[in-house]
Amino acid sequence: ADNWLRHIKDVRDRHGALLGGLADHHRLDALCELNVIEQVMHVAETTVVQDAWQRGQPLTLHGWVYGLRDGLLQDLHMVVRGTDVLDETYRAAVAEVAGRPRA
């Protein structure tokens, strides 16, 4: 089980400053959102996806999160169509999570 949880611990550590500034009841939501963003990055870096983009195949990765409280999918605006926008899209998506008002 620890191997499965290692990735979420990495996300928690990488974004510790952002998460530490949130109230306890918002921290889990933000952690889930950041995890989705990080996993889109991981998928984008796989050989299969990289090769597809190099061949010019139309392939788009999307990052969405499911809300357990409301049953709605939330678009995290982590949409990647190639390596040329990967870092910029990542930074923008993380900034959006950081700036999202949490009621």
Over which residues does each language-model region extend?
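Divalent-metal-activated hydrolytic enzyme cores
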Residues: A1-A103
